[in-house]
């Protein structure tokens, strides 16, 4: 049996962050959506267990126990509690590393879905979500891979308001933005607004309305510290904010990927093509968010 699953990029339309609690964790509130660009995870029968990487960023990720796909397999085996037939997991890595796109968590979620399909189809969604949550703060959200609100440490999930079609351009400057370093830089400041959720509309009718509400009521609290650590992020933000197609420009997660919401797919396509010509050293992808 050969199986394949898509692992979509996660985008934080907003990310509000509070100060660390007694255990060092930061409370958050975030509206997460998922793109139609991402990685792919494949599962194949094998003579012995194996994990391989491919794709344009495959050589930049660890192949051992630090990889979330490997850890997902280990967690799945512990949950089954018995021997499993050998298999090979192949990660096609198309998303940049340390990019604020939840790539590792999304890859792990795709791997868990494949392993359930192949080895334990009776395993419940709740069981699978518990495994995903054990792998990281956004593990459960990336397993669901649909628009949602995340609160607490990222484990309290609820449905997002009804969103319009959102066309966007993702841009990464080719510089990693390690999450731990960004949070430490964030902790060095004062943050009176904390992780409070903004009043949420029941629905947003258009991309223009969504962008206006996001700009007025929300923010990404990690954007400023990430820019201080990696000025190339600021360069991307400045370029995107100067383009006529950009309705809203913001960094996703802890960076370094930034996004511009556009009014239509045609406008997103035009912006992406122009950026690819202007800055061939940047990773640029047009996408739809949902």
UniProtKB/Swiss-Prot annotation:
It is an enzyme of class 2 (transferase). Transmembrane segments: none annotated. It catalyses: 4-CDP-2-C-methyl-D-erythritol + ATP = 4-CDP-2-C-methyl-D-erythritol 2-phosphate + ADP + H(+). The keyword Chloroplast does not apply. The keyword Cell inner membrane does not apply. InterPro entries: GHMP_kinase_C_dom, GHMP_kinase_C_sf, GHMP_kinase_N_dom, IspE, Ribosomal_Su5_D2-typ_SF, Ribsml_uS5_D2-typ_fold_subgr. Keywords: ATP-binding, Isoprene biosynthesis, Kinase, Nucleotide-binding, Transferase. GO terms for biological process: isopentenyl diphosphate biosynthetic process, methylerythritol 4-phosphate pathway; terpenoid biosynthetic process. Pathway: Isoprenoid biosynthesis; isopentenyl diphosphate biosynthesis via DXP pathway; isopentenyl diphosphate from 1-deoxy-D-xylulose 5-phosphate: step 3/6. The active site is at residues 10, 138. ATP binds at residues 96-106. Its EC number is 2.7.1.148. It comes from the Bacteria. Gene3D superfamilies: 3.30.230.10, GHMP kinase, C-terminal domain (3.30.70.890). GO terms for molecular function: 4-(cytidine 5'-diphospho)-2-C-methyl-D-erythritol kinase activity; ATP binding. Belongs to the GHMP kinase family. IspE subfamily. Catalyzes the phosphorylation of the position 2 hydroxy group of 4-diphosphocytidyl-2C-methyl-D-erythritol. This is 4-diphosphocytidyl-2-C-methyl-D-erythritol kinase. The lineage of its organism: Bacteria, Pseudomonadati, Pseudomonadota, Alphaproteobacteria, Caulobacterales. The gene is ispE.
């Amino acid at each position: 049996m050969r199986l394949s699953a898509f692992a979509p990029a996660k985008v934080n339309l907003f990310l509000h962050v509070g100060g660390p609690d007694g255990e060092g964790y930061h409370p958050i509130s975030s509206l997460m959506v998922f793109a139609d660009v991402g990685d792919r995870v494949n599962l194949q029968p094998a003579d012995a267990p194996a994990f391989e990487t491919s794709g344009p960023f495959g050589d930049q990720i660890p192949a051992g126990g630090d990889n979330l796909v490997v850890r997902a397999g280990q967690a799945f085996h512990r949950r089954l509690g018995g021997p499993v037939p050998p298999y090979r997991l192949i990660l096609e890595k198309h998303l940049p590393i340390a990019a604020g796109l939840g790539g590792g968590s999304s890859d792990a979620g795709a791997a868990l879905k494949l392993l359930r399909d192949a080895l334990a189809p009776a395993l419940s969604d709740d069981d699978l979500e518990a495994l995903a949550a054990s792998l990281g703060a956004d593990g459960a959200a990336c397993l669901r891979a649909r628009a949602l609100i995340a609160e607490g440490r990222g484990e309290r999930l609820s449905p997002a308001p009804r969103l319009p079609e959102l066309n966007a351009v993702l841009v990464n400057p080719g510089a990693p933005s390690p999450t731990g370093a960004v949070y430490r830089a964030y902790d060095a400041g004062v943050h009176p607004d904390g992780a409070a959720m903004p009043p949420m509309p029941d629905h947003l009718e258009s991309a223009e309305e969504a962008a206006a509400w996001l700009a007025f009521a929300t923010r990404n609290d990690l954007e400023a510290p990430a820019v201080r650590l990696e000025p190339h992020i600021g360069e991307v933000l400045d370029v995107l904010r100067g383009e006529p197609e950009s309705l809203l420009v913001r960094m996703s997660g802890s960076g370094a990927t930034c996004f511009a919401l556009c009014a239509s797919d045609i406008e997103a396509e035009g912006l992406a093509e122009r950026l690819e010509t202007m800055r061939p050293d940047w990773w640029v992808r047009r996408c739809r968010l949902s």
